């Protein structure tokens, strides 16, 4: 906290330590949540990213309440969204949904298992577009919903939570990634764009790519890689700690 205060000075109102849900597996650390310096009146605040507005609750939300490591990838979704019908699965608070709408999507559907998450996604859409944009939300299992969508969507985003937080569950996790991607690939419209991610540090980018290729074969679809994605430069990777490259993604064109 003191080091951050030295850098940011009076601009820094508070520092909140949120360790209880984020410490490494079996790290043996005494993780606690609470203020290290200062305090703010309300845990939910409005933030701005590339001109888009978001409500963020850093105390109760996942991790810091907003996934800053996906901001460059959200910008990429904005570039591809024009004229497309978009499905944002595991939407959390709707970051990708807001960017898709800003990019000119016809409509956006945001899906998450958490009722509170989809409420926040809807609030963030209204914060940016009022009631004018055709946005729907569903609080349900995203994998099950993918079975039902037919060929309604031509841009699908798969950004699930970490399926493998450690190597002991890696095999089951890869089967989960394969099923998820196969369902999306089998349903997306011809000419559609699939954004698919893994944030599991135990999953290498090579293993993730191979798993997605297997999913494409299962779905019987021909795909081309348009982009291979990673975390931004302010989430640097130590060359001696390859597991630090935890975020990997693919943008696929599906014929």
Task: Describe each region flagged by the PLM.
Residues 114-157:
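S-adenosyl-L-methionine
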Residues 153-183:
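Mobile active-site "lid"/loop adjacent to the S-adenosyl-L-methionine
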Residues 188-190:
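Helix-to-beta-strand junctions that scaffold the AdoMet/dcAdoMet cofactor pocket
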Residues 93-106:
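Conserved SAM-binding loop of SAM-dependent methyltransferases across substrates and taxa
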Residues 107-112:
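Conserved SAM-binding motif I beta-strand of class I
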Residues 1-66, 75:
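Non-catalytic substrate-recognition/targeting regions of SAM-dependent transferases
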Residues 193-255:
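C-terminal catalytic and target-recognition region of SAM-dependent MTase-like enzymes
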Residues 83-92:
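Conserved class I S-adenosyl-L-methionine
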